[in-house]
Amino acid sequence: MKQEIQKGDVATLSFEQALKQLEVIVENLERGDVPLEQSIDIYERGEALKKHCEKLLKAAEAKVEKIQLSEGGTPEGVEPLDSE
């Protein structure tokens, strides 16, 4: 089933909205029945959506903190989550 790709500013989308649009784009491109010019347009939108999702994930990751425990096992503070 061919799904419509929404237009509009990617920056205003939530992570979930952007991810859903990205999934629709992938489905449409994988089917292979999209004309070349439209494929290029939706591929470019997909790239913008991917970057937006990565930006939102990075921001969420920065908010997550790791609890520091003392030698006795009691919480004594927090530190940023290590990026690996």
From Swiss-Prot:
Keywords: Cytoplasm, Exonuclease, Hydrolase, Nuclease
UniProt GO BP: DNA catabolic process
GO MF: exodeoxyribonuclease VII activity
GO cellular component, one term: cytosol
Primary localization class, coarse: cytoplasm
Pfam families attached to this UniProt entry: Exonuc_VII_S
Coiled coil: none
Subunit-structure text: Heterooligomer composed of large and small subunits.
Protein name per UniProt: Exodeoxyribonuclease 7 small subunit
Organism: Bartonella henselae (strain ATCC 49882 / DSM 28221 / CCUG 30454 / Houston 1) (Rochalimaea henselae)
